[in-house]
A protein has these predicted regions:
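Helix-to-loop junction immediately C-terminal to a conserved catalytic motif
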Residues: 55
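Conserved ABC transporter NBD signature motif
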Residues: 63-71
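Conserved ABC ATPase "signature" region
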Residues: 71, 120-137
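Conserved ABC ATPase signature
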Residues: 142-146, 150
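Catalytic Walker B motif of ABC-type/P-loop ATPase nucleotide-binding domains
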Residues: 167-170
Length: 179
């Protein structure tokens, strides 16, 4: 399902005299359907960078990243978008959304983007928002007005509303309360 072959990532810091920082070197990883894999490491060790490369947000400096046989390092943007729609979900540490979009539509968007009927998509979004204790009175508001914990629960709902074959979770519970 997901294969990384000799993946490296370097960042060029233009505001630091073009310093080059090597974040990941020669990473190899094979994840089969049904497997659950955890990346463990210290802050700044490249875990989020690796997930962003797998999701196609960052381009690898070298190597190949295959998701269901599609190499994201050479794929066209439309191919990457199709992988994101149908194959690969992503719950990041922070929710990033358009401020004018109500929470209910933010959660339903992955379903709407693949053509699922709006009524069914919104019903599924409602179920998840209820399960994650987001008060109904907030559903028509933008999640940008929510607390950090509420935003993260919206982010989790959005990631789980569609059954992606693979789901990347980047510290999805970091801003949640113990309960």
């Amino acid at each position: 399902m997901i294969q990384l072959r000799s993946v490296s990532k370097k960042f060029k810091l233009f505001n630091q005299q073009n310093a080059i920082i090597s974040v990941i070197e020669n990473a190899n990883l094979n994840i089969s359907p049904g497997e659950c894999v955890a990346l463990v490491g210290a802050s700044g060790s490249g875990k989020s960078t690796l997930m962003r490369m797998i999701y196609g947000n960052y381009l690898a400096t070298s190597g190949s990243i295959l998701v269901d046989g599609i190499d994201l390092t050479t794929a066209e943007p439309r191919e990457i978008l199709e992988v994101r729609k149908r194959k690969l979900g992503y719950v990041s540490q922070f929710l990033r959304v358009v401020p004018r979009v109500p929470t209910l539509k933010v959660v339903a968007e992955p379903l709407l983007s693949i053509g699922k009927p709006e009524t069914e998509s919104l019903e599924m979004a409602e179920e998840l928002l209820e399960e994650l204790n987001i008060p109904k009175k907030l559903w028509q508001l933008s999640p940008t007005t929510f607390s950090g914990g509420e935003q993260q629960r919206v982010n989790i709902a959005r990631g789980f509303v569609y059954e992606f074959p693979a789901l990347l979770l980047d510290e999805p519970t970091a801003s949640l309360d113990k309960e």
